[in-house]
Every structure is written in structure tokens, then in C-alpha cells.
Regions:
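Polytopic transmembrane helical bundles with strong interfacial aromatic enrichment
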Residues: 1-183
Length: 183
């Protein structure tokens, strides 16, 4: 909320784009909602059958949004908004997809019916996305304490490296926790 309450200080940089606080806040909120909707549509499209392609398109989408934010807000505001976009996607996955699907599965089982396996598959996809976004979101949220992370004109490219590094770290921990890695 501090980015909205003090938008002229934290969110907006007239050297990047001369926006009023109200305009900056509106763009911020709209981009988070639209970002979720774009992601949700991608996940419900035929791409859901090709997880690798869906991941590549999702990765590209986040980089494009980071570039958009970098050309719209202050450098600090851009990085925090890229993290906020991914955190919004993660939260919406839980509250709008994973929990409702689980509720339907439980209701089916309680009624003595076989649950729709597609609901579980959808939940697993969204949960997997959340798993791989967790570390990049944490990095982007704490990066505001380290100006060297967001002050470059190529900061949006750093977002890509953070996404890749976060995914690689999660793969390592996923294998290790599954007992498939060295202990």
C-alpha cells in the first residue's frame, strides 16, 4: 500500500513517465488484474496440454510485463510490481482455482461419485507454477532494499535470470525432497 499512499515518491518517476498518482495507481491495479486474466486464459487454452510451451509463454509474458513496468514506473516501482504481478497470479491460483477445485473433488467424494480427474490436473498445474514462482517473487520483493538489482536500464532482463535461477533452485529442492538428489 505504501506504493499507492506515497505514489509520487515510490511508484512514479517523472524521468521515466510523467504520471499523476491517480493514473499510476490505476495503471498498477489494472495491470495486476489484466495480468492475472491473461495468465488464466493461457492456462485454460490448448496450451494446457503442452506445459513446456505454456511455461515459455508465461516466462515471456512476465519479462514483457517487467519491461512495461520499467517504462511506466520508477525503477523501484517496476521491480516491486513485477513481483506483485507474480504474487497476484500465485494468490489467485490458490483462491480462484486450487481451493475451488479441491472443494469440488471433496464434494464428489462425499457424494459417493468419482471426482473429475481434470480438476486435480488443473490444480496440479497451478500449484506447480506457484512452486516455481515462489523464489523469484521473494527476490523481487526484497530487491527494493538493494538498488543495484533494479537500477539498471536492463533490469527487466535480470527478471528473466531471476526466474531461471529460481526455477533451477526449485528443481534441485524438488528432487532432493523427493529423495532423488544427493543428501
Amino acid at each position: 500500500w505504501i506504493y499507492y499512499l506515497k505514489a509520487d515518491l515510490f511508484l512514479i518517476d517523472p524521468a521515466v513517465r510523467p504520471l499523476s498518482p491517480a493514473t499510476g495507481i490505476s495503471i498498477s491495479i489494472a495491470s495486476l488484474v489484466i495480468g492475472w486474466l491473461v495468465y488464466d486464459v493461457l492456462c485454460k487454452s490448448p496450451l494446457e496440454q503442452n506445459q513446456i510451451l505454456l511455461s515459455i509463454i508465461g516466462f515471456t509474458f512476465v519479462i514483457l510485463m517487467a519491461y512495461f513496468y520499467q517504462n511506466m514506473f520508477s525503477p523501484r516501482g517496476a521491480f516491486i510490481h513485477t513481483g506483485a504481478l507474480m504474487a497476484t497470479i500465485m494468490s489467485a491460483n490458490v483462491f480462484l482455482v486450487i481451493i475451488p477445485n479441491q472443494t469440488k473433488v471433496i464434494a464428489s467424494l462425499k457424494a459417493g461419485n468419482a471426482p473429475d480427474p481434470r480438476l486435480g490436473a488443473i490444480g496440479k498445474t497451478r500449484s506447480t507454477h506457484n512452486n516455481y514462482l515462489t523464489l523469484p517473487v521473494l527476490f523481487l520483493m526484497i530487491s527494493n532494499h538493494y538498488p543495484m538489482t533494479y537500477s539498471s536500464p536492463y533490469a527487466y532482463i535480470l527478471v528473466g535470470f531471476v526466474l531461471i535461477a529460481g526455477a533451477m533452485i526449485r528443481v534441485f529442492f524438488n528432487f532432493r525432497h523427493a529423495g532423488k538428489g544427493d543428501h
